[in-house]
Amino acid sequence: MPPKKKGKRGPSAKTKEKETVRVASEGVTEQTKDFYTVQIRDLEKRLERYQSKWDEICAKEQLKEAQYEQLSNDKKEIVSFLKRTLNQRMDEIADLNDQLLGLQQAKDAEKDAYESQLTQVRHELQDTKERLTSENMLLAGKLASLEEFRVQKEELMGKFAALEEKVKEQEQEHKEAMYILEKKVVLDKDRLKKEMVQRVSTVAAEFRRVSNNQMAETTKRAIRENVSISLQLDKMSDKSIELISENDLLKDRNSELTKQLEMLEENEKELVKNNLSNQKVIRMLTDKCQQQQEILTLLEHTQHALNELQSQHHNLKDESQQLKQKLVSLEDDLQRVTQEKEGLSRQLEEEKQRTLAVDMILSQAAAFLKDMLLTHSEDETEGMQLERRNKMLQQLQLLLDSSATLGLGSSLHEFETKQGHSLKSLKTNRQPVSPVLKGPGVTAHYRIGDLGLVPRQDVSNAVLSKTAMLSKITRLGPLRGTHGISKELLSWTQEEKQIKHSALPEISPGAPSKLLMAK
């Protein structure tokens, strides 16, 4: 209820004012009730659209925030995973670098040791080779001389064997000759003895026979024969002595050749021992050379493994570079998503500002309507009330124009060509204005069918400017051909009440309709 002013007024004045207010209310109700109702419905529909748009924007914002949070979490997880992987790769690279450095140092140390050892072995091998070459040459010379000696030995052994055979044959012949000679000597002695005995006996007989005749001649002849036999025996004895001395010489020669053969056999044994020792040294050097060859093969395998480690190191470096590039691309994607989020945040802020502007416009429109419908002063005259109401409607029009300027509604000129036929029906259904409205100072501004809400352009545009604030959706279809507005059109649905209550908390949902119905 509007506040009452102090002071007492007469019953005639009160009755006159009530009649004036009733007439003005009837005039306002007949001419503006449908306009206010359609405008309120249009504002409610706009509010519903803005509320649905706001809900969509909030849902999109929540979706975008969820997507942004998901992207942020994914980015954080990806970045953490990539950082962890990068750190892992860097640790592996560091470990591989350490291993590579250790292997390189160990390889260098082993290489230096092996090179020094190989150099030393090469020097030793060269010295041994030279020494063995010289010894081999000496041994070759000795072997050649030994071969010559062997040939000579074989020749000498052949000669010695031939000589032994010859000596044996000569010994055998000598023995046989000695035996024959001894036998012959014995036989000759026996024969000579026999002959001598016989001859002695013969000589004795003949001596006895001739002794008597020629004793002296027989004795001389026997003595001469005895002397010749003694000379033959002496010759045979000298021949035997010569054979014995020759046999002794052959035995001495045989003993000397045997001694030389023993010396040559000892030299041959020494040469065989030296040859065996040289073969052992050559075998040892061959084994050592094989060991050095195995060491070189191991070094080659180590070098190959080192090259593989270096290739793995390069591959890990390339993979780390790729991971860094991927991280940079992910950071770029994150920056792009952040920029998109900032753009969406700016759009959201703009939508919030637009929503706030719409809420402010709606609240101001509701406040103006509330002031227009609820404000009632007993001191004001009918012309002042109509003028105040006209100003409020002009302010509402300015609010709607400002909302159209902001892009939140339709402009005034969009309704001029589309809603002209609807406004004609409104003109026919309106009652003529009460004569009370034709007071001084008002007749130039207000006319029949014109509330003066918009500065008058011409007679045809005066009525169109009143409904220019309606949206394109509202076409005044339900109001055609009707003189009054039913209670069903002025009543609020439950959904409109909820939207009205959520958007305009200062105005009760049923206040405008109740006030209009009361008037």
From Swiss-Prot:
Recorded family membership: Belongs to the CFAP157 family.
GO molecular function annotation: microtubule binding
GO cellular component terms listed in the entry, alphabetical order: ciliary basal body; cytoplasm
Composition-biased stretches (Basic residues): 1-11
Name of the molecule in the record: Cilia- and flagella-associated protein 157
Residue stretches spanning the membrane: none
Annotated organism of origin: Xenopus tropicalis
Region Disordered, annotated ranges: 1-25
PANTHER family the record matches: CILIA- AND FLAGELLA-ASSOCIATED PROTEIN 157 (PTHR31954:SF1)
Stretches assigned to coiled coil: 28-185, 241-356
Gene that this polypeptide is encoded by: cfap157
UniProt keyword list: Cell projection, Cilium, Coiled coil, Cytoplasm, Cytoskeleton
Chain's role: Specifically required during spermatogenesis for flagellum morphogenesis and sperm motility.
Location in or out of the cell: Cytoplasm, Cytoskeleton, Cilium basal body
